[in-house]
């Protein structure tokens, strides 16, 4: 929810090519996040811990990206 609010705020400040560039960068980041979390989870043996590791990694990466957007692009914190 926090990331959606931050992304919406950022997109609202951009127009035209800037918004398109942000959308491309954000889409690439989402792909990286998902693939990285899967990679990390695959390093664990099959079993229930694997899904947990993937979820925790997704949450951690999302939190870090959201904080980066807030800091670098001047988004007000909640």
Question: Where would I find each of the regions flagged by the language model?
Answer:
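N-terminal alpha-helical modules
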Residues: 1-78
């Amino acid at each position: 929810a926090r990331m959606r609010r931050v992304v919406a705020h950022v997109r609202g400040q951009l127009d035209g090519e800037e918004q398109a560039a942000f959308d491309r960068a954000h889409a690439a980041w989402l792909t990286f996040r998902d693939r990285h979390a899967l990679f990390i989870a695959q390093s664990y043996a099959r079993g229930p811990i694997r899904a947990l590791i993937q979820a925790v990694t997704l949450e951690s990466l999302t939190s870090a990206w959201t904080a980066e957007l807030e800091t670098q692009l001047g988004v007000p914190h909640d």
